[in-house]
UniProtKB/Swiss-Prot annotation:
Cellular localisation: Cytoplasm
Record Pfam families: Amidohydro_1
GO biological process: L-histidine catabolic process to glutamate and formamide; L-histidine catabolic process to glutamate and formate
Cofactor detail note: Binds 1 zinc or iron ion per subunit.
Protein name: Imidazolonepropionase
Annotated organism of origin: Salmonella arizonae (strain ATCC BAA-731 / CDC346-86 / RSK2980)
Stated family: Belongs to the metallo-dependent hydrolases superfamily. HutI family.
Length: 407
């Protein structure tokens, strides 16, 4: 019988989906186990017979399924305003160009976010974050990008920091100042990129308000040349990078980000084989965002077979944002990734655990249930992991554990 030390906590009689690729079973499934937590970390995983049936700090889960805490590695959940009205306009035949000319589109979100008080912005983001927490998310990425000026980009990142400080969740903050050209720089993307590179990135990095720099390399975003200047600026400061690339066209953004050893290349619907090879060589994770694909009515699917062939890790994320993916549900994103992009349920699970952790640079501590990893996990009223993917409208979450504490 295993002797627990003072302060240890054990979850026994569990079916563990470790998501450890070294396990030879689907999902890394092992039955009849006990998981021992010490000081917020997984101390050991042992047969359930080594742990007493009951006692202080012993939780008998009666054979329930346990998985790593979910990781949503791409969100834009700090914003103000709603774009529901313009979505209805588009469905009624009004062009996006007309809506944008009337102050709609991303500019509407930028205006609303700039005008929103920081406390109000926090409350809006907190409600959205709680929806993900209630699905079992324990690590969440949040991007800025609706400020497009120093003050509001900083305000958004402060909100993300406060969410992390005051709630039982890890947050990885990303600076996305190179999201779009703001109206005050209309026709002058060079001037705006200069502001991003010479002012916004270095000043906010000094305050350590973010962990990585992101950009939108696209025909309706920034050119390859502009994107490379952002990447050069970040790399000169030792900041990890990532990119929204190949969403609407093939510009070579994935190759560019991979040359800078980017953490991830996100969207990638128009990714070609050269881009896939570059991602493999750069150690860059491909992040699939099926919510945006669905909401925009796109038809070009990411090259999943190529990604498999080149053994590029594939993550899945909600991309929650007001303009192109108003779906604050990682369960739904997993289902969409299977139905629309052809992932297997096991690949979808890897995409919201170990591969999502890698996309955030957290692969040594998050995304798997192994000794030494963070004790962030979810207990489900389910027998198989596929159930969570199969029926996204039903949430069988039984217990969420963050740093070894039931939340």
């Amino acid at each position: 019988m295993r002797q627990l030390l003072p302060g240890d906590t054990a979850w026994r009689n569990i079916r563990l989906a470790t998501m450890d690729p070294q396990q030879q079973t689907p999902y890394g499934l092992v039955d009849n186990l006990a998981l021992i937590v010490r000081e917020g970390l997984i101390c050991d995983i042992v047969p359930k017979t080594q742990i007493p049936v009951s006692g202080d700090n012993i939780h008998d889960m009666q054979g329930r399924l346990v998985t790593p805490g979910l990781i949503d590695c791409h969100t834009h959940l700090v914003f103000a305003g709603s774009r529901a009205g313009e979505w209805e306009q588009r469905l009624n035949g009004v062009s996006y160009q007309y809506i944008s000319a009337q102050g709609g589109g991303i500019n509407a979100t930028v205006s609303a976010t700039r005008a929103c008080a920081e406390d109000t912005l926090y409350l809006l983001a907190h409600e959205r974050m709680m929806r993900l927490i209630n699905e079992g998310v324990t690590l969440l990425e949040i991007k800025s990008g609706y400020g497009l000026e120093l003050a509001t980009e900083e305000k958004m990142l402060r909100v993300a920091a406060k969410l992390a400080a005051e709630n039982a969740i890890d947050i990885s903050s990303t600076l996305l100042a190179a999201h779009a050209t703001p109206v005050e720089y209309h026709g002058d993307p060079d001037g705006y990129i200069a502001l991003v590179c010479e002012t916004i990135i270095p000043q906010l990095w000094k305050k350590r308000l973010f962990e990585a720099v992101d950009l939108f390399c696209e025909s309706v975003g920034f050119s390859v040349a502009h994107s490379e200047r952002v990447l050069q600026t970040a790399k000169a400061l030792g900041i990890p990078v990532k990119g929204h690339v190949e969403q609407l066209s093939l510009l070579g953004g994935a190759q560019l980000v991979s040359r800078y050893q980017g953490l991830s290349a996100d969207h990638i619907e128009y990714l070609d084989e050269a881009g896939v090879a570059a991602m493999r060589d750069g150690g860059t994770v491909g992040v699939l965002l099926p919510g945006a694909f669905y909401f925009l009515g796109e038809t070009q699917r990411p090259p999943v077979e190529l990604l498999r062939r080149y053994q590029v890790p594939v993550a899945v994320a909600s991309d929650f944002n007001p303009g192109t993916s108003p779906f604050c549900s990682l369960h739904l994103a997993m289902n969409m990734a299977c139905v629309q992009f052809g992932l297997t349920p096991e690949e979808a699970w890897a995409g919201v655990t170990r591969h999502a952790a890698r996309a955030l640079g957290r692969q040594a501590t998050h995304g798997q249930l192994r000794a030494g990893f963070r004790a962030d996990f979810v207990v489900w009223d389910a027998e198989q992991p596929v159930e969570i993917v199969y029926e996204p409208g039903r949430n069988p979450l039984y217990q969420r554990v963050y740093q070894g504490q039931i939340t």
